[in-house]
Amino acid sequence: MAVVAVAGGTGGKGVPGAANEPRRYAVDYDNVEEMRNVLKENNVEVVVSALLLSDESVAKSQINLIRAAAESGTVTKFIPSEYYIDFHSPIPGSDLFTNFQIEAEEELMRHPQLTWTLIRVGIFLDHLTMPFNPKPTYITPYWVFVDIEHEECVFPGDGSQPLVLSHSTDLAAYIECLVGLPSNEWPRESLVASNKIQVKDLQDLIKKTTGTLCGHLGICIRTFLILAIGREFKVTYDSVESIQKGQITPLTSNRPVFDDPQKGKLFQEVEVQVMLSMLSNAHDLPGKNLAELFPEVHVTNIEDFLRAGWEMKQGLKP
């Protein structure tokens, strides 16, 4: 069994399901030698980075981690923190995170002893039902497109853009499979695409999965019909012009997120980047679909997930 090190694995997208409690090490990400020794002494073979590349300091930490892995003599596989879109795709009006991701890719190319893959996931499905989570999640609370609590949606343009949605547990399952795959079979670009839709499809999915059952008696034909009446969410389509100006209708649940004095500005920048990336069709994701390599993985169906989230909301109502 391979020894795997997860950098940043105590929160966010990096928490795997494991039968045994993993060992934890506090390391100085500015000290390549220290990290190299920790990796070597523990015979680590695979490094999975779950660092949130939110600024230059964290991006530099991942660069140092790559160098430590390359110098360890034990690490042969590396998965950088990507888990979103192809950062080579141009997104007019936003370069948020782009340089950090490309710098990591360039650093990996300098170390031929490492096998690596860039994993594209799109938007995490986890965001769509928060704070009602049908499956375990460690994703930071933040709302994208749908606010199930306040029954509202905000979509970009006409909503016709391609969208990939996968749950964080789907990503974890595929990473576990990749760890066991021989290095020569690793794709350079990997795709986790549990659900492929257009953004505007979310409106119909919401209506379909928030249905409440009611009976209707047909007097003439003497039949009893069970109808599902879906909830009508408030839906806003932000215009292309507004998005390009950074004027995006905030989902109600995001308002306190944006008001946070430490992270609010970053999340507002993320919101703009997500909407601009949708307009440029950057979510038409490339890569080898891991569902083809690992058909045994049971991924999260968006319809089932939304329905379960809605049912949790109904059950938690006072």
Swiss-Prot record:
InterPro entries: NAD(P)-bd_dom_sf, NmrA/Isoflavone_reductase-like. Keywords: NADP, Oxidoreductase. GO terms for molecular function: oxidoreductase activity. Pathway: Mycotoxin biosynthesis. It is an enzyme of class 1 (oxidoreductase). Its EC number is 1.3.1.-. Gene3D superfamilies: NAD(P)-binding Rossmann-like Domain, UDP-galactose 4-epimerase, domain 1. It comes from the Eukaryota. PANTHER family: NMRA-LIKE DOMAIN-CONTAINING PROTEIN, NMRA-LIKE FAMILY PROTEIN. Aminotransferase; part of the gene cluster that mediates the biosynthesis of swainsonine (SW), a cytotoxic fungal alkaloid and a potential cancer therapy drug. Swainsonine production occurs via a multibranched pathway and is dispensable for fungal colonization of plants and infection of insect hosts. The first step of swainsonine biosynthesis is the production of the precursor pipecolic acid (PA) via conversion of L-lysine (Lys) to 1-piperideine-6-carboxylate (P6C) by the aminotransferase swnA, the latter being further reduced to PA by the reductase swnR. Belongs to the NmrA-type oxidoreductase family. Isoflavone reductase subfamily. This is Oxidoreductase swnN. The gene is swnN.
